[in-house]
Regions:
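Interfacial loop-to-transmembrane junctions
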Residues: 279-301
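Aromatic-anchored segments of alpha-helical transmembrane domains
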Residues: 160, 231, 298-305
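Long, contiguous internal "core" modules enriched in hydrophobic/ aromatic residues
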Residues: 22-27, 41-44, 107-286
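Extramembrane terminal tails and long inter-domain/linker segments of multi-pass membrane proteins
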Residues: 1-12, 47, 86-88, 119-142, ...
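Alpha-helical transmembrane segments and their helix-start/interface "positive-inside/aromatic belt" motifs
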Residues: 15, 47-61, 95-100, 142-150, ...
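Membrane helical hairpin/interfacial module
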Residues: 27-107
Length: 318
C-alpha cells in the first residue's frame, strides 16, 4: 500500500478532518479533567492565576469550537448542521454527542466564569456595564460551585470517552467495533491535555519549572501513559483473540505496509518511547526546549494514534 492509497481506499468513510476533530476534543476533555483534579488535590494552586486553569480557559472551549467548525465544514451540506443541534435522537451516537457537547459547553462556561469571577466582572463593567445579570448569575452559582465542578468532571470524562464511542459505533468495521476504544481515547486525551499544559507552564514560568501544578501534572502523566500502553496492548490482544473479521482487521493494520510503519514509528516510537528516553534529559536540563521536545513528541504521538485508529480501522469491513 502506497502513502496515497493509504489515505484513499474504497471502504473509507471518515477521513483526516475527523482525526483532527477527535484530537482537539481529547485535548479539551484532558485539560478540563486535569484542571478539576488539580483544584481538588491542590486547591491553593488551582486559582485564577494557575497556568493550567488559564490554558483550560483558552483551549477548553477553544478546541471544542475549532473541532466542531472542522466537522461542520467537512459535511457535504454544512448548512444542515443546525438540525442536529435541535433535533435529538437517543438512537443516534452523533445526536447524543451533540447533546453532550451542548451540556459540556454550558457547564464549562459557568464553571470557568466562576473561577475567573473577578476578571469576568471587570470585563463586564468595562464593556457591558448595563449587563448586571452577569454578577447575579455568578452570585447564584456560588453555593453550587463544587457540585458544578463535579458535574464538569463527569462531563469531561464522558466527552473524552465519547470520541472512542463515536468510532466504535461503526459496527461494520471489526477493528473499530471494540469496547476498549472509548477508554483508550479517554486516557490518550488526558495525556495530550497534560502535554499541552506542561508546554504552557514552561512558556510562562521558564525560571520556575518546578511549580506545584507542574509536579501534579507530571505525577498524573506517568500512570496515564503506562495505562495508555496497557490499553493499546489489550486492544490488539482483543483483536487477535476475536473472530475472523477482527483477526483480518488486525492483520491489515499491523501485518505490514504503510499503517504498520505509521504505528511503530509514529505512535509507539515518536509518541511513547521517545518521550520516555528524553524525559531524564529534560528533567536534568529544566529548560523550555526539553519540555517542548518531550511534550511535543507525546502530543504528536496522540495525533498519530487518532489517524492510525481512524484509517487502519476502516481498512477491513466485516
Amino acid at each position: 500500500m502506497t502513502s496515497a492509497s493509504a489515505f484513499h481506499f474504497e471502504s473509507l468513510v471518515w477521513d483526516w478532518p475527523i482525526a483532527i476533530y477527535l484530537f482537539l476534543i481529547g485535548i479539551s476533555a484532558g485539560l478540563v479533567t486535569l484542571a478539576i483534579l488539580l483544584r481538588r488535590f491542590h486547591p491553593e494552586a488551582g486559582g485564577s492565576d494557575s497556568t493550567l486553569l488559564r490554558t483550560t480557559l483558552v483551549l477548553g472551549p477553544g478546541a471544542i469550537i475549532f473541532g466542531l467548525l472542522i466537522l461542520v465544514f467537512h459535511l457535504t451540506r454544512p448548512w444542515t448542521f443546525w438540525k442536529l443541534m435541535f433535533h435529538y435522537s437517543f438512537t443516534s451516537v452523533m445526536s447524543m454527542g451533540v447533546m453532550l457537547f451542548q451540556l459540556y459547553m454550558v457547564v464549562l462556561v459557568l464553571w470557568l466564569a466562576k473561577i475567573f469571577e473577578k476578571e469576568v466582572i471587570a470585563l463586564q463593567q468595562r464593556w457591558l456595564p448595563r449587563l448586571g445579570i452577569v454578577q447575579k448569575v455568578l452570585t447564584l452559582i456560588t453555593p453550587f460551585h463544587r457540585a458544578l465542578e463535579t458535574l464538569m468532571l463527569v462531563l469531561a470524562v464522558l466527552l473524552g470517552a465519547y470520541t472512542g464511542f463515536l468510532l466504535s459505533a461503526l459496527k461494520s468495521y471489526p477493528f473499530l467495533n471494540n469496547p476498549i476504544l472509548p477508554v483508550l481515547f479517554l486516557f490518550s486525551g488526558i495525556s495530550s491535555g497534560a502535554a499541552v499544559a506542561l508546554i504552557a507552564m514552561a512558556l510562562r514560568h521558564r525560571s520556575n519549572p518546578h511549580s506545584t501544578e507542574a509536579h501534579f501534572v507530571h505525577r498524573m502523566e506517568v500512570p496515564v501513559v503506562w495505562l495508555e500502553i496497557f490499553l493499546l496492548a489489550a486492544f490488539f490482544v482483543g483483536l487477535a483473540l476475536g473472530d475472523d473479521g477482527k483477526m483480518r482487521a488486525l492483520a491489515a493494520a499491523l501485518g505490514g505496509g504503510f499503517w504498520t510503519w505509521w504505528f511503530w514509528l509514529g505512535v509507539a516510537g515518536l509518541g511513547l518511547i521517545l518521550p520516555m528516553l528524553l524525559k531524564p534529559w529534560a528533567n536534568r536540563s529544566s529548560t523550555f526546549h526539553g519540555v517542548l521536545a518531550v511534550c511535543g513528541a507525546s502530543l504528536t504521538g496522540v495525533l498519530l494514534l487518532r489517524f492510525f485508529i481512524l484509517y487502519a480501522g476502516q481498512l477491513t469491513v466485516a
